Amino acid sequence: LLTDRDVLDAQIPGRDLLIVTNTTVAKLYLARLTGSFAQRRIAECILPDGEQHKTLQTAGWVFDALVANKMNRDATVLALGGGVVGDIAGFAAASYQRGIGYVQMPTTLLAQVDSSVGGKTGVNHPGGKNLIGAFYQPRAVIADTDVLATLPDRELKSGLAEVIKHGCVWDPLLFNWLDRSIPQLLARDAEALTYAIGRSCEIKATVVARDEREHDLRAILNFGHTFGHAIEAATGYDKYLHGEAVGLGMLIAADLSHRLGLIDAAVKERLRDVMVRTGLPTEAPRIGAARAYELMQMDKKVVAGAVRLVLLEKLGRAIITDQYPKAALDATLAEHFK
């Protein structure tokens, strides 16, 4: 798709185009993509790679590029990269001149199955993840599975964590399929990856269509994220990939669900087994229970000081609640964060 002019011309409007990417992806795909456009005025903004660079300062470089190239409201921002690039580019597009067009071309599995769909954009703050941002829908998402051939194994596994999440909260058949298909997915079998991506996008699109602004239902897609975001923030956004932190968060949320009697031990252990066989971490960092809870209080689902959590009732069904004994949460945090 990177070189398919018919697709690019149909999905990416306007003459003026700012391609936002990072140093890693630029070396692999930027020249190939820019060579696929005819009669366009193209500018480039190449960002440093990594979650630790998902900041207002980095977003400022995108604004600088838009201004320097005299881009107006007819321009389009094209995000070529993973979740960090997509979030920053989308945030810049949402903010510049109060909103210009943008298109996502996700190059990681995590971005293709999750972050490129749904319109969440933003940057991190030292006080918490994604605290600064906007809901802003891309005009198109162009997911080329061929680019996953160059994705590092660790990034592939990180993306699979979000597929596992979709199975946990919405589709037990997807979870069962994942349970059987981990070897094929890790081997990058094209048919398996295409199904995982397609089904994940269907699930997320269904949920977002019912609750775009995350008033209630969409919050189930944050399963594992309240704990996971605390892990990312506590470790400076540079020790764990996003999917790795979310995977740890799902295990912690499943443990709490079990303590509350919502699921039995077999469900919790089955989820852990899938994580282990996927090659995802299963032991949370020892950041301390008090620090973890402090960071959780900055979560966007907090209402009137109450930390709302996404918990499992069974595989394929999640609830959002703040009605749980604080002692159960404290015991869970103490168990996992020491």
How would you name each of these model-derived features?
Residues 18, 161-163, 262-338:
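C-terminal charged capping/lid subdomain of soluble metabolic enzymes
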Residues 84-91, 112-113, 229-230:
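Short glycine/serine/threonine-rich phosphate/pyrophosphate-binding segments
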Residues 88-99, 234-235, 255:
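Alpha-helix C-terminal capping segments
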Residues 91-184:
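A glycine/threonine-rich phosphate-anchoring loop and its flanking beta-alpha core
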